[in-house]
Amino acid sequence: MFAACGGTLAAPADVSVDLENTLTWSAVTNASAYTVEISTLDGSKLIDLVKEETSVNTYSFDSRRTTVELSNSNRFTLNEGDYIIKIKALGKTKGTSDSDWSEQYSFHKEYETGCKYVLINGGTEYEVNRVGKASGTIVIEDNYRGKPVTRIADQAFKGSVKIVDVTVGNNVTYIGKAAFSSCPKLERVVLPEGVTTIGESAFQSCSSLKEIVVPSTVKEIPYNTFAYCASLEKVTLNEGLETIGELAFSYGSSLKEITIPDTVKTIGNYAFTVSKVLEKVNVGAGVETIKEYAFSRSSELKSVNFASQASLKKLETNAFSYCTKLTGVILPDGTEDIGEACFYGDSEIKEITIPDSVNHVGFGAFDLTGLYEASGEYVYADRWLVAYKSETRDVVSLGKDQIKEGTYAIADSVFTKCQRLSDVTLPSSVEIVGRMAFIECPLLYKVIMPKVKVISYGAFASCSILTTVDFGNVLTTIEGYAFMGCSTFDNNKYSPEDTLPDSVRKIGALAFYNTQLWNTATNGVVFCGKWAVGTTTFGKKDKSDNWESISTANLTIDEKGKDKITCVGIADYAFIVQHAMTTISATENVRYIGKGAFYACQSLTGIALSDDLRDIPDYAFMGCQSMIKITLPSRLRSIGKSAFYACARLKEVDIPDSTTSIGTNAFNSCINLFNVKFGEGITEIPDFAFFGSGLVGITIPENITVIGRKAFGKSPLLKNVIIEGNVTEIGYAAFYKTRLTSIKLPDSLERIENSTFYGATALSKVDFGKGVKEIGDYAFYGTGFRNIAIPENVETIGSYAFAKTNARSITLRSSLKNIAENAFYSANQAVVYAESEEALAGWRQGWNSSFLPVIYGSTISPEGYVESFTVSKKNTENIYKVVKVTDDDGEHYEYTTVKITLPGRYGLMCAGFATTAGATEAEYTDGDVFGLPDGTVLYTVWREADESDNPLDKFIDDIFKNLDNEQNDADSQTAKMLLSGRFGEYLIK
């Protein structure tokens, strides 16, 4: 920028202040110096005494200088606050005029930490979102400029090389993803009670961090939070924590001991992997799952202690692998599953205690441990036979000489592909045969298992010459594929009683597929003893063998002259996709039905279930599109997941009192299910249980306390819901897109969950009950409300909670503490009646303020409609719409008076107004002109609606028309009233 000799200098341009608090501008040619003027927003100018020849309000310096530090400088000492900066260029030679002032630059000076604070949540809170010149010790204040600091943004301090110590303010609840990651000098962080969320990688690679105390309000330490914190010596985890996430403390090299609190349920994948000096782990009583590689390669780990009364159920794959100094482990009672390679490579383990509750030990769980040092070819972990370490795997016969008495179980894959093994006789102590324990043993022809209770998945699969098996008399479970491909297996040559014991309760899918049993099928049904285990048409396109009717109650099978038998059980997926099957009679003897037993039997119209049936398992009748009726047994205990999913013609269900649980999706997409009766045993309706059903009405009895996510969602005919008592939780979108017109919520309910009634377009009346404190996001989005009456106990209204409702009036109580952004989005015909300004906490956010006028000081009845309001000059000034404008003063809000709608009342019509409370006759009616003294209280007068009122569609166009301000009487106002319907509008000028 320049000026000709004798001219006027150009004004400085490009004025700005960067993150380092350095003021810069573009140099002006021929300028001899510059004047910098800094003032506060109220016009008070700062005083600078550095240059005596300049004004005390300005600072001049050489033209070569086009920057000046605003902080850490003796020239300017600025406190935190807002300032206006402008700069003038001074002429160098005589005849050269000084420039005009530059355009004003608004500048906000941060705290000396250099943190950048940004308004969020509609201007009610602050977030720290970047670091600025932060160095050394940082204190994030509780409040900033009078408002709480509640969040630290994602990556706010990421990569800062100067910060050493951070104290987080007491109002902060959220610490963002990677907020402090890669801060190499950060040694100390103090987190307050009240923090609820710590983001992923929040402190990752803080290599100098020595100690951390996680507040009790934090429920989860997520992915990578403290990974690669090489100096982290002490971690305090408080009660309240529930989940330690994947890689949360991985690759630490200083942490020697960790105590997991009792409230933690899950320790995530790789959570403490490669903790190089970790020596001791104390596992709390609440931990249920230790996931894959959680403590893997913690090479100094010597001790793992489980709390008494532990809840541990599962150790997943490689959970403690390569912990080379771990000498022993005592697993607590209740543990059920030890995953593959769980202790793989733990070379010092010499002893382990496995409780009888364990029902599965995965392949290689104890490979390369100290247990291998014991003599003999067979490796034992406590009472489990876990490995056969022969290189040649040439065992021929397994019996008591090979498997020691007292052995409880055989782990997964121990004898897989033993090429010479011909016969197996298990000791009477063995109760479990693991997954694929003897798979593909080509010479195995005989198995005797006198006391085995569980034969696991694929245990003897593809043993091609296995002919007979003695199952003993206590067997309860044969899992899927257990004998699949044993092409010569034919136990049906024995009497049915000798084929399978009566103790069997479950047979998995395809457990006997491709055995000789398929060649002895009766009417297309494959039996093993008294169990129907499949059909001859499985996997075939040809349906010529299909049947139209099967009687399993009286089904008789000729077993080569033996006595005839009846069916007692149906295996998992036994009749899957039998399209031609129409009826089944199973009333007498079938006590067990397997998972997915009749999956997608599209022509099945009904089934009579035995009174002895106790459980209907997952997917049992899923996709039986022709099923019209089902009578549930009087002693039924449970209905599994998706048990009747998409039974499109099923009309009604009566759930007996004996039933205590219903699985998720149990009756999902039963589009013609119009009637359901709940018994006294049900306490919870699970997620999606009746989603997309044909229900018209439903009564929720007193014994039910929880209604799950989308439980009745998208049921297009559901119009009436009666909740009789004690529901404490209604899940996300539980009634979304239904045809509800009204509902009474119980006093026991404290929160209306997000999207609970989303898109229920006919819903116009809700009795909120006395307990509701919070209304979630989108809770009533797109409903049919005309008058929204928020009850006095509600404290919080979520985003878009009442958006798209076309409401004409909104009444708000003083109990409200926060109204989220756009809570009433698109309700642009409404007027808001608020008991006080306190009722509008957080109101000026988004559509709430931009489009809706407000009247303060309204009197609202317990039912939520407006009883009266005061006509006064003060009130006149407070009837407005907030409009965002941009002018010379920048972007700001202005108020304009607008035509507003009078309050509504469900089922009644406005008859006019009276100055006496409780009046039955209106004093002012259509066409009246009247004067109203300042402070007059007008009371609405209501009457019953009649047919001519058309209350659902007709609304008052104008009630107060032209509030006459031509009168200069300070004590009165004049209005003309026009009444025409249920709601009204008036214009105040």
Model-assigned labels for residue ranges:
Residues N21-N30, F913:
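Conserved aromatic anchor
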Residues L19-L23, T896-V898:
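Structural beta-strand segments of beta-rich domains
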Residues N523-G524, T631, I722, Y856-D949, ...:
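Secondary-structure capping and domain/repeat boundary segments
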Residues D154-A156, G176-A179, G199-A202, P222-T225, ...:
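Consensus positions within tandem repeat domains that build extended binding/scaffold surfaces
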Residues I38-L78:
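Recognizes extended acidic, P/S/T-rich segments that occur
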Residues T93-K109:
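Extracellular fibronectin type III
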Residues K116-N121, K133-R151, V161-Y174, P184-T197, ...:
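Structural signature of tandem-repeat unit edges
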Residues F76-G95:
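Beta-strand-rich modules
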